[in-house]
Amino acid sequence: MSFKVSCKIHILCFLLAYIFCYIQIDNISNVFVDLVTNYKIFRLTDIYFIDIIIAILVLTIPITLLHEIIHGIAYSLFGGKVKFGFKGIYAYTQEISGVILHRTKFVLILLSPVTFISLAMLLIQNSIGSVIFLLNLLGSTGDIIMAMYLVKSNSNSYIKDREYGFDII
């Protein structure tokens, strides 16, 4: 059985992120307005909307890199070798040594970035921490969907990472 990251999965990730943002729109708006009003580094123009877009772009790049590095560290802890890359606008970490991992280990690898970054942001209790938490959570929707898919599989199964997703063995 295989899990393939397809256009359908990307749309599902976008929809989940959209629903979350729609439900939390007031909180999210307050956090971003606080970010651009209280931190001079993010106040680049006199238009809040443009400042918010710039802040999102500036913060998304290092958050994404850290997210993928955490995946890589988790793979390494379980004996894998990784390569990092980009496919379109998406960054990815891929296990390249062919190691086959128990389902539980693979779920830990999938969820390690959202877990560690979220916990770290509890220590930064200001709007920057909130924005980093939010952007990482939204960027982790694919990992969460894959973990949910795996949790439904046999608990004794093994996973082989593939370029297109993963195989359940």
What positions do the PLM features span?
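Catalytic Zn2+-binding segment of zinc metalloproteases
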Residues: H71-K83, S153
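Short secondary-structure junctions
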Residues: R43-T45, K81-V82, S157-I159
